[in-house]
């Protein structure tokens, strides 16, 4: 099933509303996506604004040309995202996020705060971390 150009502002979504669905050019605003198991999902050209994204499990999950702004990402194993994987983060808090072995060339991480995040063997060539802070 595909959802195109929709603004989603419902505060609490159910896991079944998101799994098995492809989203294109949608805006997710003030959404809480905590403890979800995303299976067979694709988000392309979507924007996530002021969202809480914690402790996700990702299976057959794609993220293509998406933007995260003013979001909290915590306990996410981004290494489970399928290729291609392209996104930008602006003014986001990232805690315990695993980027190990991802190819994130030319990714944008502007004014983000990284706490206890893993980047081992991650390809970050030409990525922009302007204004970002790192703490372990």
Language-model-detected regions and their locations in the chain:
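Tandem repeat scaffolds
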Residues: 1-136
């Amino acid at each position: 099933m595909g959802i195109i150009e929709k603004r989603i502002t419902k505060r609490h979504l159910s896991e079944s509303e998101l799994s098995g669905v492809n989203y294109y050019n949608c805006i997710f605003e003030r959404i809480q996506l905590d403890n979800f198991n995303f299976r067979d999902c694709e988000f392309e050209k979507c924007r996530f604004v002021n969202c809480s994204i914690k402790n996700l499990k990702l299976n057959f999950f794609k993220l293509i040309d998406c933007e995260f702004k003013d979001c909290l990402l915590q306990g996410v194993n981004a290494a489970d995202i399928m290729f291609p994987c392209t996104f930008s983060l602006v003014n986001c808090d990232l805690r315990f996020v695993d980027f190990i072995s991802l190819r994130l060339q030319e990714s944008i991480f502007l004014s983000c705060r990284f706490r206890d995040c893993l980047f081992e063997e991650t390809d970050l060539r030409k990525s922009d971390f302007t204004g970002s802070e790192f703490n372990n």
